[in-house]
UniProtKB/Swiss-Prot annotation:
It comes from Chlorobium limicola (strain DSM 245 / NBRC 103803 / 6330). The gene is tmk. Its EC number is 2.7.4.9. Disulfide bonds: none annotated. ATP binds at residues 7-14. HAMAP family: Thymidylate_kinase. It holds the Pfam family Thymidylate_kin. InterPro entries: P-loop_NTPase, Thymidylate_kin-like_dom, Thymidylate_kin_CS, Thymidylate_kinase. It comes from the Bacteria. This is Thymidylate kinase.
Length: 219
């Protein structure tokens, strides 16, 4: 089984992934948590190239690097884990590519889908949790500021995060369009809700859709 989490940086994906991972371990459900880009030796090196702010990368180059990292992760780790009955929890998958490179970088969608199919080996998530938040709120959360304007050191941002608010507004709209087209796969969550409440909604969705999670209890 493949469970994916999506959302712009600052939405709280990492928090929810940690909570889910801890719960599955406690319930003795075999699981593995991975991230994109990354997850293999080669993919982690690609991650460094993609996120280091000193690198200038063209939109197509960025797409191909993300896709190369994904292909390594899917073939070497994710598919073998799923074949062994392991539940895979993945921080970002191809929906990020559609939102970031397709909507944010405005890369042709037909070309995008071809590359996604190749890099994923046609693998689809069983369920995707999307944490929705505005870019403004995400940035405030990231730097623990209470109101705009936000004062911060841009050197603290990675290359993707420095793309600007307009870019992330496009990315967010991309995600919302993706959800509209794939409503059965997605669970839409308000990232500004209480983290524990979000966690409970995630578990409720898993229990509702998949019998393997029916015995899980949350506090």
């Amino acid at each position: 089984m493949l469970i994916t989490f999506e959302g712009i940086d600052g939405a709280g994906k990492s928090t929810q992934i940690r909570k889910l991972q801890k719960l599955l371990i406690g319930a003795h459900i075999d699981s593995i948590t991975l991230r994109e880009p990354g997850g293999t030796e080669v993919a982690e090196k690609i991650r460094q190239i993609l996120l280091e702010s000193r690198h200038e990368i063209s939109p197509i180059g960025e797409l191909l690097l993300f896709s190369a990292s994904r292909a390594e992760l899917v073939q070497q780790v994710i598919l073998p884990a799923i074949d062994n009955g392991t539940t895979v929890i993945l921080d970002r998958f191809f929906d990020s590519t559609i939102a970031y490179q397709g909507y944010g970088r405005e890369i042709d969608q037909v070309m995008l889908q071809t590359i996604i199919t190749l890099s994923t080996f046609s693998l689809q998530p069983d369920i995707t949790f999307y944490l929705d938040i505005s870019p403004e709120n995400a940035l405030m959360r990231k730097f623990s500021e209470k109101s705009l304007p936000i004062a911060f050191d841009e050197s603290e941002l990675d290359r993707m995060e420095r793309s600007g608010l307009d870019f992330f507004r496009k990315v967010r709209q991309g995600y919302l369009d993706i959800i509209h087209k794939n409503e059965r796969r997605f669970v839409l969550l308000d990232a500004l809700d209480d983290p524990q409440m979000i966690h409970k909604r995630i578990i409720a969705s898993l229990k509702e859709r998949f019998p393997v999670f029916s015995g899980i209890k949350t506090r």
